[in-house]
Structures are given as structure tokens and as C-alpha cells.
């Protein structure tokens, strides 16, 4: 019963409202608030009232302005970085070593015979063009041509041309091996894209690759280079890529350098190791590669001391006498330090170790710790990235390099209908080659130079929130020395596991020694933390309010209370106005007063 009476009183109180007018409520607030300023507005004389009203309004505006800046700063989610340096026991990095040449020439010579003959003849033609006018280049059937039996099947797919720019407005294009009249001295079609990579106006002739689309609307682009050697090398790589794309993976592995031939000696700390401690992986750019301490099938190794005596020591034999002449112009080993279970992208992140040297690499580990959403758009494991990671077939962790290449391969398949040889394949896709996909080189070159496709991949891929980078300090010395080279052990295989039946000798042009170790300070941690937190925001808001108006949280509650009272009064006034309007409409519908009881009785009797 008491509870019912209480709710009835509450209902009546709500219907009645605060019991003040707007003016009375405002005067009551100014007289009772703990905020400085409003009290003086109602207690001082007319002049001071105006002054205090102006000051209160000014400082209140300053408070709201400062609050806006603080809230905007907080919502920007800025970060601050901290740096720490020291030495601690850490995982030794995974070390990937490859030969600069992806294959042994002795094992792929039969595949490249036609291409090598074309390359040799093309170089001869280019050399001839240096000594005569470009338009007088000899045709294929000339008696002066030394290569009359060339098979031009590969050449017709992707030819090399000379571009004579004696007249810049009308450049003349000459095929090195002209097979019909349509190509001799032809000028580029107006619909063809402009010649790319023209960097030197002084040179009258340039060597370029002619890449054509053979679809319904034929179109050609010309990729020209600053040097003939560079043009021939890029052309050779493109042609050989098409050839090797048709070879099964198990056969290409057999064509490369085997671990027992390449890794002669291994020592980690004081423990001996061998090629059996390396995990093989096939890399399209460098053939067979071998990873030490990858941590994929075994526990990662740790290092607790700085210096070369506690690191990894390797002796490698690159056998550069078996390099592919036109494919590999660099002799040495390609190596990369990377995190465990991450894929080594040697073409972009690897370094070369020169043959005939002892290369010492001091390692400093950079640990990057980024804040996640909403402070940055990084990803923890790539699960929130819209690009399918094609490198998952290696059971490796996510990286932005893997994402960018997977994105490019997906666009390559979508645009060209096949996949590029340098990247893993999506399911159900085959590698591009000139026989099955005659337009692939044109399509690949167009896609590679497309800014829109490139930007799409950049926008789709995310950086990892936690990343490890290895900074290297590299020093080199000749190895072996002239005196040591005379030692007997330098004239025979350095490992007992090597085939002793072969009369194999080693020379400084094919042998490399590597020392990889942690420096005195082996780690540097760069970590991000939130520059603004909710605690910072509340304290800053309170500080500004207290400084300008002497207020506190209770003052804000008081202000909130009067706002509620204002709204309450407004609702009641609107409600009363609605009731009055309804009554007026009712009176307008029935203008006469209702009859009394006696009038109703009299009317009934008269009936």
C-alpha cells in the first residue's frame, strides 16, 4: 500500500514538473552552482553583471574550444615510440643461402640451346649496328649473316628491335632478324603506347623488347633500355622464364645445385653441422636454396654470447664455372637473414657474398611492436587481409611481401589467364609460357607497369603488428690468402661427405666463407604505446574546466541537472499546450452549453 502511494506521488511530481519558470530556474542555478562566475552575474550591479556575464561566456567558450581540441586529439589515436637497446639470449636468425645461378648450365644446356644461339646472334647484330647506320641492318638471308640456320620460333614470340631516334618525332623500328617486309623500317602505330624508359637523348639508337598482343585488336609496346647488355639480359630472363615454366618442379630441383655439393663445411658455435641441418626450398629466382635454423621441423637455436665464435660459420662452393652465361652475370652466394618460419624473399631483401672472400656479418635485431586497431591498420597474422596468401603452401607466417606477391599473382591470373613463374600458383592455375599463352609477356608487362593494379595491392595488404628485422654490419677480406691457397687441404674437397671419386679441386673463384654472429648489443626494441588514453582525456578535460571556470565533475552534474529541468519544463509546457488546443477544438464543435437535467426531463415529458 505504501509503495502504491509512493508511485502515485512520483507520478504527480512528474506531471507537476520542477515548479519553476525558466527564469526562476536559471536564477536558482546561478545562485547555487559551485562554478565560479555565475553567482556574480545575479548579485552584482548592472555594469558588473554585464562584465561577469561576458567573462563567464568567454571562458565557457574557451573551455568548449579546448575540449574540442582534446577530444579530436584523443580520437586521432596517435602513438608514441620508445627505444630500448641491450643484449639478451635470443633466437639465432634463420639463414637462407642460395647460389647466384639458379641452375647448372651443364644440366639445362639442352633446354637453352636455341635461346643461346639467338642471343649470340642478336649480340652480334647489335654490335654491327654500332658500326653502321641503323637502317642498313642486314636481313636474315644476307650472305654476311653468320647465323643462317637459326630457329626464329622464340624470336618471333618476343623479338628484340633497334629504335633509331635520329628523328625524335618519327622514330624508326628495325627488327634485328627481319623475316618479312612489314617490319623493316616500320614506324610505331599511333595507337601504340609511347616508348617507355627513354632516359638518354644523346643516344640515337636503343635496344628494346617488342611485346605484342595477338588478340582481336593487336597492340604492341616497346620496353627499351639504357644499355644493350641490360636489354639482352632482361630479354633472356623473360624467354628462359617461359621455358622453365613448362618443366615440372622435381626436374628443376635436379637441375640446380645440390646441398652436398654447395655446403662444404658448417659450424654453429662449437658444434659441427652439415648440409643435413639445412632445410631445402626451391626459389624461382635462385633455384635450390637451403635454410639453416628455419624452425619449421625442429626447435630454433638460441645464442647467448656475442662474437664470431658463437655464431654460424659456413664454407660454400658456388662452382661458377657452371653458371649460365647469359642468365647470371653475378658470381657469388645470395643469402638472407630472416625470422623463423618466414619465407625468404631473397630478390628484394637478400645480399650477395662475393667469391674468394671471407664475409663476416654482425647482426643486430630490430624488434618492431606496433599498436593495432584503431591506432594503425596492421594485422597480427594476416587473417583479416582480403588477399589469399599463396605462400601458405610453405607453412610460413604472414608478411607484407607474401601478400603483395600473392595479390599480383591473383591479378595476373585474372588479367592474363595464367600465373607468373616467380610466384606460387593458385589452385587450378598453370604457369604462363609463350606456346600456350602467346600474349602473356605483353599482359605481364602491362600489368607490371599499371599504377592502378599496384595501388590496389598496396591498399589491400597490411603490415604485421609485430615484426623482426635484421640489421647487418658486413666486412670482407680475401680468402684464402695466397699462402693458404698452397695448402693441400685447399686442393681437395673440404668435406669428407663430398664425392671423393671425382678429381675435384677448389679455387678462390668458387669458394666463399661466411661468419654470422650477434654483435655486442644484439637487440633494439622499438615499441609503440598509445599517446593519449581515456585517463589522459578525462584529466585534461577536468584540468581545462578547473583552470578556466574553477569547476569540477560535480559542477558538470549540476549543469546536467538544470538541463534536465529545462527539458522537463519544456515537455510539460508542450503537453499543456496540446491539451489546451484539444479543448479549444472541442468547444468550437459544440458552441452551446450542454442541457441541464431538468431541461432533459421536460423535453422527455413533452414528447
UniProtKB/Swiss-Prot annotation:
Cystine residue pairs: 98-289, 212-220, 266-273, 378-465, 403-461, 407-457, 416-443, 418-432
Annotated organism of origin: Pelodiscus sinensis (Chinese softshell turtle)
Function: This is one of the three pore-forming subunits of the heterotrimeric epithelial sodium channel (ENaC), a critical regulator of sodium balance and fluid homeostasis. ENaC operates in epithelial tissues, where it mediates the electrodiffusion of sodium ions from extracellular fluid through the apical membrane of cells, with water following osmotically. It plays a key role in maintaining sodium homeostasis through electrogenic sodium reabsorption in the kidneys. Additionally, ENaC is essential for airway surface liquid homeostasis, which is crucial for proper mucus clearance.
Gene Ontology annotations of biological process type: aldosterone metabolic process; artery smooth muscle contraction; cellular response to acidic pH; cellular response to aldosterone; epithelial fluid transport; erythrocyte homeostasis; gene expression; intracellular sodium ion homeostasis
Domain of life (superkingdom): Eukaryota
Location within or outside the cell: Apical cell membrane; Cytoplasmic vesicle membrane
Protein name, per record: Epithelial sodium channel subunit beta
UniProt family annotation: Belongs to the amiloride-sensitive sodium channel (TC 1.A.6) family. SCNN1B subfamily.
Protein's membrane topology: Multi-pass membrane protein
This protein's encoding gene: SCNN1B
Gene Ontology molecular functions: ligand-gated sodium channel activity; WW domain binding
The keyword DNA damage appears for this protein: no
GO CC annotation terms, alphabetical: apical plasma membrane; cytoplasmic vesicle membrane; external side of plasma membrane; extracellular exosome; sodium channel complex
Residue numbers on the Extracellular membrane side: 72-551
Subunit organization: Component of the heterotrimeric epithelial sodium channel (ENaC) composed of an alpha/SCNN1A, a beta/SCNN1B and a gamma/SCNN1G subunit.
Amino acid at each position: 500500500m505504501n509503495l502504491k502511494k509512493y508511485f502515485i506521488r512520483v507520478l504527480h511530481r512528474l506531471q507537476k514538473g520542477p515548479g519553476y519558470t525558466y527564469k526562476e530556474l536559471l536564477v536558482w542555478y546561478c545562485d547555487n552552482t559551485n562554478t565560479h562566475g555565475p553567482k556574480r552575474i545575479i548579485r552584482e550591479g548592472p555594469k558588473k553583471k554585464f562584465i561577469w556575464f561576458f567573462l563567464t561566456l568567454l571562458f565557457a567558450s574557451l573551455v568548449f574550444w579546448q575540449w574540442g581540441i582534446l577530444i579530436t586529439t584523443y580520437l586521432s589515436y596517435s602513438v608514441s615510440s620508445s627505444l630500448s637497446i641491450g643484449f639478451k639470449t635470443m633466437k639465432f636468425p634463420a639463414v637462407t643461402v642460395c647460389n647466384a645461378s639458379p641452375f647448372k648450365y651443364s644440366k639445362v644446356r639442352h633446354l637453352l640451346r636455341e635461346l643461346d644461339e639467338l642471343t649470340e646472334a642478336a649480340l652480334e647484330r647489335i654490335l654491327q649496328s654500332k658500326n653502321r647506320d641503323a637502317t642498313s641492318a642486314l636481313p636474315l638471308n644476307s650472305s654476311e649473316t653468320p647465323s643462317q640456320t637459326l630457329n626464329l620460333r622464340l624470336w618471333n614470340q618476343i623479338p628484340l628491335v633497334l629504335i633509331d631516334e635520329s628523328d625524335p618525332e618519327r622514330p624508326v623500328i628495325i627488327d634485328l632478324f627481319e623475316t618479312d617486309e612489314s617490319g623493316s623500317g616500320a614506324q610505331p602505330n599511333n595507337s601504340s603506347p609511347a616508348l617507355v624508359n627513354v632516359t638518354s637523348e644523346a643516344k640515337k639508337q636503343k635496344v628494346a623488347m617488342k611485346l605484342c598482343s595477338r588478340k582481336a585488336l593487336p597492340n604492341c609496346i616497346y620496353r627499351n633500355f639504357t644499355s644493350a647488355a641490360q636489354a639482352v639480359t632482361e630479354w633472356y630472363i623473360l624467354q628462359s622464364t617461359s621455358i622453365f615454366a613448362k618443366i615440372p618442379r622435381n626436374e628443376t630441383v635436379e637441375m640446380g645445385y645440390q646441398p652436398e655439393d654447395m655446403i662444404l663445411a658448417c659450424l654453429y658455435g662449437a658444434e659441427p653441422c652439415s648440409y643435413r641441418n639445412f632445410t631445402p626450398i626451391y626459389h624461382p629466382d635462385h633455384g635450390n636454396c637451403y635454410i639453416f635454423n628455419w624452425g619449421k621441423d625442429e626447435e630454433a637455436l638460441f645464442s647467448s654470447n656475442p662474437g664470431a665464435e658463437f655464431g654460424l660459420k659456413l664454407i660454400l662452393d658456388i662452382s661458377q664455372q657452371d653458371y649460365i652465361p647469359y642468365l647470371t652475370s653475378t658470381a657469388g652466394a645470395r643469402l638472407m637473414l630472416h625470422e623463423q618460419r618466414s619465407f625468404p624473399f631473397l630478390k628484394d631483401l637478400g645480399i650477395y657474398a662475393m667469391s674468394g672472400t671471407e664475409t663476416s656479418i654482425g647482426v643486430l635485431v630490430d624488434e618492431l611492436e606496433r599498436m593495432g586497431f584503431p591506432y594503425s591498420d596492421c594485422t597480427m597474422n594476416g587473417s583479416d587481409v582480403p588477399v589469399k596468401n599463396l605462400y601458405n603452401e610453405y607453412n610460413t607466417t604472414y608478411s607484407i611481401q607474401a601478400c603483395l606477391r600473392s595479390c599480383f599473382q591473383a591479378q595476373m591470373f585474372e588479367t592474363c589467364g595464367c600465373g607468373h613463374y616467380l610466384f606460387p600458383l593458385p589452385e587450378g592455375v598453370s604457369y604462363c609460357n609463350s606456346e600456350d599463352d602467346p600474349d602473356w609477356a605483353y599482359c605481364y608487362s602491362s600489368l607490371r607497369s599499371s599504377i592502378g593494379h599496384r595501388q590496389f595491392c598496396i591498399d589491400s595488404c597490411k603490415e604485421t603488428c609485430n615484426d623482426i628485422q635484421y640489421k647487418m654490419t658486413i666486412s670482407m677480406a680475401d680468402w684464402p690468402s695466397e699462402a693458404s691457397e698452397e695448402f693441400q687441404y685447399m686442393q681437395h674437397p673440404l668435406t669428407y661427405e663430398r664425392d671423393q671419386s671425382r678429381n675435384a679441386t677448389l679455387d678462390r673463384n668458387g669458394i666463399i666463407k661466411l661468419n654470422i654472429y650477434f654483435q655486442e648489443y644484439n637487440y633494439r626494441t622499438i615499441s609503440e604505446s598509445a599517446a593519449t588514453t581515456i585517463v589522459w582525456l578525462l584529466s585534461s578535460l577536468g584540468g581545462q574546466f578547473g583552470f578556466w571556470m574553477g569547476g569540477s565533475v560535480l559542477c558538470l552534474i549540476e549543469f546536467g541537472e538544470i538541463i534536465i529541468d529545462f527539458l522537463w519544463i519544456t515537455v510539460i509546457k508542450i503537453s499543456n499546450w496540446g491539451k489546451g488546443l484539444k479543448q479549444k477544438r472541442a468547444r468550437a464543435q459544440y458552441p452551446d452549453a450542454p442541457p441541464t437535467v431538468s431541461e432533459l426531463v421536460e423535453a422527455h415529458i413533452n414528447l
